[in-house]
Amino acid sequence: QVGSAEEINLPDRSIDVIAVAQALHWFDLDRALPEMARVLRSDGVVAAVWNQRDASIPWVAKLERLLGRQDSDFDPQGFIEADERLHLVGAQEFRHWQVLDRDQLAQFVNSRSEIVVLPPAARAERVNAVLALYDEYDRGGGLRMPWISRCFRVRLRLADAVEPATDVPDDDGTLLIDFK
């Protein structure tokens, strides 16, 4: 089913978790939060995740300069804590690596919003600069992109939240996400 955060095509009180990656700050929260509250069960949570590249690695620091800074000034926890409708229940940070070959790095760069909006010649110049960086640092087997995933468990606090449905759908046992 297709929907948006502002129009979730699910029954009232039908889900336990809403997972949002890299996007909560882009939603129209005045519309999205009541809609999330409508579909979440009374003990449901929003799982919000933001991924950031770890620029403490030299080649990644150079990549950051070539791409333009990522949302490094954006503080997801501060964003959550600043909104009285959001209650931070828990936070956890995870580090992981992604191995990228030359083509995958080019695809990654071409998918970045700050690159997509460039005129074609400027985009090609930027991609070529990143590929030169790849060639400088690759020792065979690809480059390891270090990521920091910041994960937050959030409960909604809305005064005008939808009252629990009296006809809560039966739990059919379907597990949509397995975090094990």
Which residue ranges define each predicted feature?
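Conserved residues in the N-terminal Rossmann fold of short-chain dehydrogenase/reductase
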Residues: V2
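A short acidic, Gly/Pro-enriched loop at the edge of an enzyme's catalytic core
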Residues: E6-I18
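Short glycine-/acidic-enriched loop or helix-start segments at secondary-structure transitions
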Residues: P11, L29-D30, I57-P58, E163-P164
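A short SAM/SAH-binding and catalytic strip from SAM-dependent methyltransferases
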Residues: D16-D30
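Conserved catalytic/acceptor-binding region of the Class I
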Residues: R31-L100
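Conserved Class I S-adenosyl-L-methionine
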Residues: G78-K180
